Amino acid sequence: MGSGGPLLLLRGLLLVGAAYCAAPRPPRHSSRPNVLLVACDSFDGRLTFYPGNQTVDLPFINFMKRHGSVFLNAYTNSPICCPSRAAMWSGLFTHLTESWNNFKGLDPDYVTWMDLMQKHGYYTQKYGKLDYTSGHHSVSNRVEAWTRDVEFLLRQEGRPKVNLTGDRRHVRVMKTDWQVTDKAVTWIKKEAVNLTQPFALYLGLNLPHPYPSPYAGENFGSSTFLTSPYWLEKVKYEAIKIPTWTALSEMHPVDYYSSYTKNCTGEFTKQEVRRIRAFYYAMCAETDAMLGEIISALQDTDLLKKTIIMFTSDHGELAMEHRQFYKMSMYEGSSHVPLLVMGPGIRKQQQVSAVVSLVDIYPTMLDLARIPVLQNLSGYSLLPLLLEKAEDEVPRRGPRPSWVLSEFHGCNVNASTYMLRTDQWKYITYSDGVSVPPQLFDLSADPDELTNVAIKFPETVQSLDKILRSIVNYPKVSSTVQNYNKKQFISWKQSLGQNYSNVIANLRWHQDWLKEPKKYEDAIDRWLSQREQRK
């Protein structure tokens, strides 16, 4: 960050705001725009509009809202890092990419939207976190996902905690993210400014994802919300909402499993919950400042008025809503993502209420680059919802559906999960659609998702389930995932040979496992002896 810090950056952007608004909108058939996508990790989309935006100062997101459009109902297609990013980079739903968990993503040679833009004349550049190809993440993460059908219940995460570092002068807390942000800024100022062709720039950030905790001891995994006093002062404590929790005995069975494996079934004081949420919001403020660095670099090089900017996240963060932290859930805190777009031709100060999802980014990028949109994509271009003038609309395939789909097949959840979101309803079903009860929430009357009304509205459940089955044969997909998990675990177990017992006893669940290791090994053996699920 420059010597003046975020405040000076913001003042500079406020001064250029009028000039940006007055900049002429390039005609539809003029040179193609530059495109920038900033994708962070674990950012709750509800913080980008009222009332969530009252909780923390996010000046650069607000700048994008004033000079562009914000989507009020944007969702991840899978609330976990790799599967979500696989959907975003491929334009395909998770059951089509078969990115079932954080270890299984796209093939390295898969043609992404950025590959096509490069093929059609764009100069492309990527910095930071990508995380959409196979073979990443820890052994613990893989094994926990593969064994979620085993009949045992083990804590897989550390109890969420906070950590305050530095003083009021400590701005750059997440050093890795600031380093890649600096690289992107340098590239803009030294390389992009001299290009004779349009560019597509991607910046991937780790924040506001919780930080890793010590592997051994009472806390392990990635459960630390870390920030400095500088960012914590951006949070309005009086506006922090303490979530209402359902009693453990009344929780949906999948929610209870998630809460237990995330180590959240113990006692938490209101002060603990408030601090966890405050530290998370402070991490969001630091993320916003990195976005500001990029916007300022574009302004300094006179590229801002020539560039379409998108800001989003792979998923959200529950931050102790529904007695959980992390993601891996279809509740709003986890599945609702930010999506803001600004640039030449984009409507300003617009709030878009249509339901959209991350698979829509692929066709949108192709539209921006004047590349014919592939017909097999799961997503639809966002441009018809964004462009200032009707004549600017690009040819597209059929009407946008009135729903979005999200699905989850990874760790911390013991059943494949499918979510269909419409304008009013959120329908969540599991596994084969029979063995686990569904959930239905009326988000217009119950935005906190505290009352499952599936029994009260059986016709709505039936109607939404019919739509869902027309999109995906989810019982078959669930069976496919179960068989995949078992085969992967068997292969991993065989690769360890005599070391299997020692290795599995030292994964993230080691504290619970070591209490009764024989019991848990026997449970795995029973699971392995069961017949393969029919597809």
From Swiss-Prot:
Disulfide bonds: none
Record keywords: Calcium, Glycoprotein, Hydrolase, Lysosome, Metal-binding, Secreted, Signal
GO MF annotation list: arylsulfatase activity; glucuronate-2-sulfatase activity; metal ion binding
Residues binding substrate: 129, 252
Cofactor annotation remark: Binds 1 Ca(2+) ion per subunit.
Classification via SUPFAM superfamilies: Alkaline phosphatase-like
PTM characteristics: The conversion to 3-oxoalanine (also known as C-formylglycine, FGly), of a serine or cysteine residue in prokaryotes and of a cysteine residue in eukaryotes, is critical for catalytic activity.
The keyword Hydrolase is annotated on this UniProt entry: yes
EC number annotated for this UniProt entry: 3.1.6.1, 3.1.6.18
Residues of this chain annotated as glycosylated in UniProt: 194, 263, 376, 414, 499
Domain of life according to the entry: Eukaryota
Protein task: Catalyzes the hydrolysis of pseudosubstrates such as p-nitrocatechol sulfate and p-nitrophenyl sulfate. Catalyzes the hydrolysis of the 2-sulfate groups of the 2-O-sulfo-D-glucuronate residues of chondroitin sulfate, heparin and heparitin sulfate. Acts selectively on 2-sulfoglucuronate and lacks activity against 2-sulfoiduronate.
Protein name (database record): Arylsulfatase K
